[in-house]
C-alpha cells in the first residue's frame, strides 16, 4: 500500500511539474521528495493508530477435559471421532460390575431394614402386652402384701414374719419386672421414633447411600456434555481410567460460536471499542476476507497477572505477554465452518476516527491475504 501511495504521489508530482512547467533544479526536486515523504508517513501513521492491525490472532475454542467421576476399566469407546456428537451420546463406558454390586447390596440392606422396622413394631406391641401383664401381676402382689401388712398390725397376727417378708419380696420383684419391661418398651419405641424427614434414620441413611451408589453407577457411562466433537481419541477398551482432575482421558470440543482472539499493541487501546467493524484473513484461506465485529476487550493484560508463590514478584517482561486481548465475532460464512479450530489469522479493526484512511488498511489487509498464496517448502 505504501508503494502504491508513493507511485501515486510520484505520478501526481510529475503531472504538476508538466502542467505548471515547474523548473527541475536542486530546490524543486528535494522539495517534492520531502513532500512525498511527509505525506506518505503521515497517512501511514494515521492509519496505524486509528485502524489497529495485528498478526497475533487465532480462531479460539474452549475445550472441556473429560474426566470420569468414578474409577474403572474402559470397556467401550465411541467411534465418532471428529464428527458431530449430540448432547447425551455415549463417549465411553467403564466396567460397572462393582458399582452394580454395591447398588444391589444396598437395596437388599434397605429391604432388611424395613423388615426389621416392622419386626420392631410387632416387638413393641408384644412388649406393651408384657408390660400390662407385669403391671397386673404387680398389682396382685401389692394387694397381697398390703393384706399381710394389715394383718401384722392386728392384736393377734395370723401371719408369720416369713409370710410377710415373702409377700413383700414378691411385690418388689414384680415392680422391678414392670420397670424392666417398661424400659425395654421405651427403648424399642425410641428406635421406631428416630426419624429423618418422616423416615426411619437407618432406612434414610441406606437410601442416601443407595442414591450415591446409583449416581456412581450412572457415571460409569460418560456422555457428551453438549453438542460437539471429540478428537484424538487415545483410550481403548482395557484402559484404566482414574478419577483424577489432572489426568483427563479425552478432550471434548463443544459446538460454540466461532470467535477470533487477537492481541493488539497497547498503543491501540484508545482506538479499540466494542462494536467497531473488523476484518479477518486466515493463512488457510488466501484471497478471502471475513467481516465481523469487535465483541469485547479483556480487562486484564496477560503479562500483568501474578499469583502467590511465597517469593517476591518481579515485572513480567516476557515477549508477547504485554498485548491487549480482544475478541472478534465473525459474521456467518460457509467457509468458516470448514476451518479447524486454533488456526492463525490477521485482524484489522476500523474505528470511527479518520475513517477515510481506513481504505488504506483494507487494501493492505487484502494484499496480506493474497500473499498467503506465496510460500516455499524445502
From Swiss-Prot:
The keyword Cell cycle does not apply. InterPro entries: CusB-like_dom_1, CusB_D23, MFP. The chain crosses the membrane at residues 27-47, 57-77. It is a multi-pass membrane protein. The keyword Cell inner membrane applies. It is found in: Cell inner membrane. Residues 1-15 form the signal peptide. One of its GO terms (biological process) is transmembrane transport. Residues 48-56 are cytoplasmic. Coiled coil: none annotated. Keywords: Cell inner membrane, Cell membrane, Membrane, Signal, Transmembrane, Transmembrane helix. Belongs to the membrane fusion protein (MFP) (TC 8.A.1) family. This is Inner membrane protein YiaV. It comes from Escherichia coli (strain K12). The gene is yiaV.
Amino acid at each position: 500500500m505504501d508503494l502504491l501511495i508513493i507511485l501515486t504521489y510520484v505520478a501526481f508530482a510529475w503531472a504538476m511539474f508538466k502542467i505548471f512547467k515547474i523548473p527541475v533544479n536542486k530546490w524543486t526536486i528535494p522539495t517534492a521528495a520531502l513532500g512525498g515523504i511527509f505525506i506518505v508517513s503521515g497517512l501511514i501513521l494515521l492509519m496505524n493508530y486509528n485502524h489497529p492491525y495485528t498478526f497475533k490472532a487465532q480462531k479460539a475454542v474452549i475445550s472441556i477435559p473429560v474426566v470420569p467421576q468414578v474409577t474403572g476399566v474402559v470397556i467401550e469407546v465411541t467411534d465418532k471421532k471428529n464428527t458431530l456428537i449430540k448432547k447425551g451420546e455415549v463417549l465411553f463406558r467403564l466396567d460397572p460390575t462393582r458399582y452394580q454390586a454395591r447398588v444391589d447390596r444396598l437395596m437388599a440392606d434397605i429391604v432388611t431394614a424395613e423388615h426389621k422396622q416392622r419386626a420392631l413394631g410387632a416387638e413393641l406391641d408384644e412388649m406393651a402386652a408384657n408390660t400390662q401383664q407385669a403391671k397386673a401381676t404387680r398389682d396382685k402382689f401389692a394387694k397381697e402384701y398390703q393384706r399381710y401388712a394389715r394383718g401384722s398390725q392386728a392384736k393377734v397376727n395370723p401371719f408369720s414374719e416369713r409370710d410377710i417378708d415373702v409377700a413383700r419380696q414378691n411385690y418388689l420383684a414384680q415392680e422391678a419386672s414392670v420397670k424392666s419391661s417398661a424400659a425395654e418398651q421405651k427403648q424399642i419405641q425410641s428406635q421406631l421414633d428416630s426419624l429423618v424427614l418422616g423416615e426411619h434414620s437407618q432406612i434414610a441413611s441406606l437410601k442416601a447411600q443407595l442414591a450415591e451408589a446409583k449416581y456412581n453407577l450412572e457415571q460409569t457411562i460418560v456422555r457428551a456434555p453438549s453438542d460437539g466433537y471429540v478428537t484424538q481419541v487415545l483410550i481403548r477398551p482395557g484402559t484404566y481410567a482414574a478419577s483424577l482432575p489432572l489426568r483427563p482421558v479425552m478432550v471434548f470440543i463443544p459446538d460454540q460460536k466461532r470467535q477470533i482472539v487477537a492481541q493488539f499493541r497497547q498503543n491501540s487501546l484508545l482506538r479499540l471499542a466494542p462494536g467497531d467493524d473488523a476484518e479477518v484473513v486466515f493463512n488457510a484461506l488466501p484471497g478471502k476476507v471475513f467481516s465481523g465485529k469487535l465483541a469485547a476487550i479483556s480487562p486484564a493484560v496477560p503479562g500483568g497477572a501474578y499469583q502467590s508463590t511465597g517469593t517476591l514478584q518481579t515485572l513480567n517482561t516476557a515477549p508477547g505477554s504485554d498485548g491487549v486481548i480482544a475478541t472478534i465475532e465473525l459474521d456467518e460464512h460457509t467457509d468458516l465452518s470448514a476451518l479447524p479450530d486454533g488456526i492463525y489469522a490477521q485482524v484489522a479493526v476500523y474505528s470511527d476516527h479518520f475513517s477515510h484512511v481506513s481504505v488504506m488498511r483494507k487494501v493492505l489487509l487484502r494484499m496480506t491475504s493474497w500473499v498467503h498464496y506465496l510460500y516455499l517448502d524445502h
